[in-house]
Amino acid sequence: MTKGSVFIIMGPPGSGKGTQSQYLANRIGLPHISTGDLLRAIIREGTPNGLKAKAYLDKGAFVPSDFVWEILKEKLQSQACSKGCIIDGFPRTLDQAHLLDSFLMDVHSNYTVIFLEISEDEILKRVCSRFLCPSCSRIYNTSQGHTECPDCHVPLIRRSDDTPEIIKERLTKYQERTAPVIAYYDSLGKLCRVSSENKEDLVFEDILKCIYK
């Protein structure tokens, strides 16, 4: 990665990070890097690291910082990210935020953090009605009426960690570990808050206002 623009999309599970990150990637032409997708990819490959990641995710636990960081850093150093990128799902702890800050300073990249705000009730409603394409990892909602991915033509599946019990546990851990990260970026003047309870297109308009203000 050389000097460029990096956009970090943050928010609790079910806030629409992946959807909005992909909208932004399509609009500004930068690659979308999802740590969740990176982890699910190595899980599908069945590597030792993939099996380790699966054990954490299946019980709703966070994957260790150093483990996630090494996977993400390799992606950030690729040619695809030479002009910048959109990061979704990282950082989740202050340690991760400091690792990413140090890396971005070394390569002289500017960055903006978009924080998607959403209530717990709305999160539970969304997460319990979403399905995943096992091939491309795109998320679909039951209200869309899809039973298979329109692009990959494979049946949609429900993620093993998309249950009310696991989501509530993840939200508790999220508040404990990620709330300080939000405060940290806010103190640096890097944070822009956006409500993600509106329709997807309206949320995206608010994100663009943050970027171009």
UniProtKB/Swiss-Prot annotation:
Its EC number is 2.7.4.3. One of its GO terms (biological process) is AMP salvage. The keyword Metal-binding applies. Pathway: Purine metabolism; AMP biosynthesis via salvage pathway; AMP from ADP: step 1/1. Keywords: ATP-binding, Cytoplasm, Kinase, Metal-binding, Nucleotide biosynthesis, Nucleotide-binding, Transferase, Zinc. AMP binds at T35, R40, A61, F62, V63, G89, F90, P91, R92, Q96, R159, R170. This is Adenylate kinase. The lineage of its organism: Bacteria, Pseudomonadati, Chlamydiota, Chlamydiia, Chlamydiales. The gene is adk.
